[in-house]
Amino acid sequence: MARITVEDCMERVSNRFLLVQMAIKRVKQFREGYEPLVPSKNKEIVTALREIAAAKVVPEDELSAAAAENRAE
């Protein structure tokens, strides 16, 4: 499996600090029992970064904007 880099994730999330917060939140979710959204046999943090790079996990503000857009329709 190809190596994941922060630069891969920065294509989806423009702020490094937000990227770190998203990855940490996702790792905590894994530890609470949530299932990964992408196949991975790596450590939790690598799996979280893979999910972000694959756009399976998005920032909350993007999610809120999409929900508001759906309500407007």
From Swiss-Prot:
Biological role stated in the UniProt entry: Promotes RNA polymerase assembly. Latches the N- and C-terminal regions of the beta' subunit thereby facilitating its interaction with the beta and alpha subunits.
Gene Ontology BP terms: DNA-templated transcription
UniProt-listed SMART domains: RNA_pol_Rpb6
Pfam annotation, one family: RNA_pol_Rpb6
NCBIfam families hit by this protein: rpoZ
Keywords: DNA-directed RNA polymerase, Nucleotidyltransferase, Transcription, Transferase
Subunit structure: The RNAP catalytic core consists of 2 alpha, 1 beta, 1 beta' and 1 omega subunit. When a sigma factor is associated with the core the holoenzyme is formed, which can initiate transcription.
Reactions listed under catalytic activity: RNA(n) + a ribonucleoside 5'-triphosphate = RNA(n+1) + diphosphate
Name used for this protein in its record: DNA-directed RNA polymerase subunit omega
Listed GO CC annotations: DNA-directed RNA polymerase complex
Gene name of the record: rpoZ
Family: Belongs to the RNA polymerase subunit omega family.
EC number, UniProt record: 2.7.7.6
Species name: Oleidesulfovibrio alaskensis (strain ATCC BAA-1058 / DSM 17464 / G20) (Desulfovibrio alaskensis)
Upper taxonomic lineage: Bacteria, Pseudomonadati, Thermodesulfobacteriota, Desulfovibrionia, Desulfovibrionales
Enzyme class, broadest EC rank: transferase
GO molecular function: DNA binding; DNA-directed RNA polymerase activity
